[in-house]
UniProtKB/Swiss-Prot annotation:
One of its GO terms (biological process) is protein transport. The lineage of its organism: Archaea, Methanobacteriati, Methanobacteriota, Methanomada group, Methanobacteria. Homodimer. Interacts with the ribosome. Binds ribosomal RNA. The keyword Protein transport applies. Belongs to the NAC-alpha family. One of its GO terms (molecular function) is RNA binding. Pfam families: NAC, UBA_HYPK. SMART domains: NAC (SM01407). HAMAP family: NAC_arch (MF_00814). NCBIfam families: archaeal-type nascent polypeptide-associated complex protein (TIGR00264). Residues 9-77 form the NAC-A/B domain. Keywords: Protein transport, RNA-binding, Transport. This is Nascent polypeptide-associated complex protein.
C-alpha cells in the first residue's frame, strides 16, 4: 500500500503522526532526475521518478514510482575487431559465432575461446 493514496489531507496527517510515533519517518526525495537499476544483462531506467524514503529502525527503504524502460547491456557492448579475429583464428569459428561468444562472456577472450573449442 502506498501511504496517502485515497486519503484526505487530515487522514494523511494522522497517519504520518502515527508512523512518526512508531519510529517511522517518511520523506519525499526531491530533485531526482533518473533512477537506474543495473542488472547483469540489462538496466531498468526510470526518468523523472517520484522517490520516497522511509526510515525505520535505522534502515532506509526507497520507494520509486514512474514509467520504467529497459535497456539491454549485451546489445550495446562493442567488441573490438581484433578480439573477434583472434577468437575466429583460435577456434575456426565464424565471425557471427565469435562475436556472439564474446558478447555472452562480456568480452572475455579466454572464456569465448573455451566455449567455442
Amino acid at each position: 500500500m502506498i501511504p496517502g493514496m485515497g486519503m484526505n489531507p487530515k487522514q494523511l496527517k494522522q497517519m504520518q503522526r502515527a508512523m512518526k510515533q512508531m519510529g517511522m519517518d517518511m520523506k519525499d526525495l526531491r530533485g531526482v532526475e533518473e533512477v537506474v537499476i543495473k542488472l547483469k544483462r540489462k538496466e531498468i531506467i526510470i526518468k523523472n521518478p517520484k522517490v520516497n524514503v522511509m526510515e525505520f529502525m535505522g534502515q532506509k527503504t526507497y520507494q520509486v514510482t514512474g514509467k520504467a524502460r529497459e535497456r539491454s547491456l549485451e546489445a550495446e557492448m562493442e567488441i573490438p575487431e581484433d578480439d573477434i579475429e583472434l577468437v575466429m583464428n583460435q577456434t575456426g569459428a565464424s565471425r557471427e559465432d565469435a562475436t556472439r561468444a564474446l558478447q555472452e562472456t562480456g568480452g572475455d577472450l579466454a572464456e569465448a575461446i573455451m566455449r567455442l573449442s
